[in-house]
């Protein structure tokens, strides 16, 4: 029986005192044995955490005791082992970094579409369907008919839209992302750029995979997640992908059969672009990671690459 609850959460809400919230929030996480990373900014809160059932419930009881977060929603999945090494609360300018001044989901967002209604919307031939995630995420799974912007970070999304789409020609735009936060902010940007009918998937891909029966699904592949599970399948069970610590790309079972795959050091996506200095550093890093795992200790060398994309 799985014992670890993984909770993905976010809410766009004005938090003028977000700096002062950091310490009590961090203490709540630590007191309840909850691990993972939460981001705080004036525009809201975002992150993924994991812990026992009691620990996660205690965290959300604390969050919802603040009237501004009383209706915060989250998505849960489950795993057998703790997927995060550390507990962090970071202060940021944005809880998901778009880098465009004036974009404020607290003031305007597109139309939310529930998971049960998503298939009907994206089956409309007049709807432009855009995957707002990074290129390596799209490569392992996306919705049927979705456009891949091939962006490496969310900061590249505005320029992609400017270069490829015109509000006068593209009347209906639907967007999606892992948990809903990126496409919600993207919808605010799109409205500000003049697009009139903008839709986004409430709860993101994770909510869709949770609620829509697989036989009715228009999702193809796995969904990348920002923890040590790497990917999840349609029933939110852990997928078969691993992740290369050197380049952060997901690696499939086939990739792991390659002569260029060395756990923690290189994979078919990056083996020919790494310097010997980088390889040497990766070897030492992997050695320390394995030692830490054997001792059941936190990752000893800073940021876990599986969490680093949370902000991008």
Curated annotation (Swiss-Prot):
Residues 282-293 have a biased composition (Basic and acidic residues). The active site is at residue 177. One of its GO terms (molecular function) is oxidoreductase activity, acting on paired donors, with incorporation or reduction of molecular oxygen. Keywords: Oxidoreductase, tRNA processing. Its EC number is 1.14.-.-. GO terms for biological process: tRNA modification. Residues 282-312 are annotated as: Disordered. Residues 123-217 form the Rhodanese domain. Catalyzes oxygen-dependent 5-hydroxyuridine (ho5U) modification at position 34 in tRNAs. HAMAP family: TrhO. Belongs to the TrhO family. PANTHER family: RHODANESE-LIKE DOMAIN-CONTAINING PROTEIN 7-RELATED, THIOSULFATE SULFURTRANSFERASE/RHODANESE-LIKE DOMAIN-CONTAINING PROTEIN 2. This is tRNA uridine(34) hydroxylase. It comes from Pseudomonas aeruginosa (strain UCBPP-PA14).
């Amino acid at each position: 029986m799985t014992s670890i609850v993984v909770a993905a959460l976010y809410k766009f809400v004005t938090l003028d005192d977000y700096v002062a919230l950091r310490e009590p929030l961090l203490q709540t996480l630590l007191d309840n044995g909850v691990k993972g990373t939460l981001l705080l900014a004036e525009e809201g809160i975002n992150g993924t955490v994991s812990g026992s059932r009691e620990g996660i419930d205690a965290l959300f009881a604390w969050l919802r005791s603040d009237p501004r977060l009383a209706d915060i929603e989250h998505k849960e999945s489950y795993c057998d082992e703790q997927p995060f090494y550390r507990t962090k609360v970071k202060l940021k300018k944005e809880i998901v970094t778009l880098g465009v001044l004036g974009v404020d989901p607290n003031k305007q967002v597109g139309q939310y579409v529930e998971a049960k209604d998503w298939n009907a919307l994206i089956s409309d031939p007049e709807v432009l369907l855009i995957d707002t995630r990074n290129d390596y995420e799209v490569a392992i799974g996306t919705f049927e008919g979705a456009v891949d912007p091939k962006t490496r970070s969310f900061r590249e999304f505005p320029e992609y839209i400017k270069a490829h789409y015109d509000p006068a020609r593209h009347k209906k735009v639907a967007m999606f992302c892992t948990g809903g936060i990126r496409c919600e902010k993207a919808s605010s940007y799109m409205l500000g750029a003049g697009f009139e009918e903008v839709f986004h998937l409430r709860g993101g891909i994770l909510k869709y995979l949770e609620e829509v029966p697989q036989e009715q699904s228009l999702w193809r592949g796995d969904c990348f997640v920002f923890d040590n599970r790497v990917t999840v399948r349609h029933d939110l069970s852990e997928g078969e992908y691993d992740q290369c610590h050197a380049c952060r790309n997901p690696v499939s079972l086939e990739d792991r059969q390659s002569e260029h795959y060395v756990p923690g050091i290189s994979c078919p996506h990056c083996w020919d672009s790494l310097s010997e200095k980088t390889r040497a550093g990766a070897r030492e890093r992997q050695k320390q990671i394995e030692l830490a795992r054997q001792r059941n200790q936190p990752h000893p060398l800073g940021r876990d690459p599986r969490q680093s994309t949370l902000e991008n």
